[in-house]
């Protein structure tokens, strides 16, 4: 049985690394808004995402926060104002 987790990733990284982080996360998760991605992944994908982000960021200057939930249903998501990228839109 494949175990999945729902991730919410927010980041604040140096301007010289923003595009690398954003481009990488777009291959793995759904873009929500500036510096925020979310989506369901397997545990092995989760580990790969963490490893690849570690390779991109500068631990002395950058910040990446990863929230993990058992499922999307375990997370209450309430958007105030403009929703920049609704998750129900398929690209």
Swiss-Prot record:
Q: Which of UniProt's keywords are assigned here? A: Antiviral defense, Endonuclease, Hydrolase, Magnesium, Metal-binding, Nuclease
Picking any one GO biological process from the record gives: defense response to virus
Is the keyword Hydrolase in the record? Answer: yes
**Record keyword Zinc present:** no
Under Enzyme Commission nomenclature, its number is 3.1.-.-
Q: What class of enzyme is it?
A: hydrolase
Per the entry, which co-factors are needed? Mg(2+)
Q: Which domain of life is it from?
A: Archaea
Which Gene Ontology molecular-function terms are recorded?
metal ion binding; RNA endonuclease activity
Q: Where does Mg(2+) bind?
A: 12
| Signal sequence annotation | none
Cite the InterPro entries for this sequence.
CRISPR_associated_Cas2 (IPR021127), Virulence_VapD/CRISPR_Cas2 (IPR019199)
Q: Name one Pfam family in it.
A: CRISPR_Cas2
Q: How does it assemble?
A: Homodimer, forms a heterotetramer with a Cas1 homodimer.
Regarding protein family, the annotation reads: Belongs to the CRISPR-associated endoribonuclease Cas2 protein family.
Q: Which NCBIfam families match?
A: cas2
Biological function: CRISPR (clustered regularly interspaced short palindromic repeat), is an adaptive immune system that provides protection against mobile genetic elements (viruses, transposable elements and conjugative plasmids). CRISPR clusters contain sequences complementary to antecedent mobile elements and target invading nucleic acids. CRISPR clusters are transcribed and processed into CRISPR RNA (crRNA). Involved in the integration of spacer DNA into the CRISPR cassette. Functions as a ssRNA-specific endoribonuclease.
Which protein, by its recorded name, is this?
A: CRISPR-associated endoribonuclease Cas2
Q: Which organism is it from?
A: Methanothermobacter thermautotrophicus (strain ATCC 29096 / DSM 1053 / JCM 10044 / NBRC 100330 / Delta H) (Methanobacterium thermoautotrophicum)
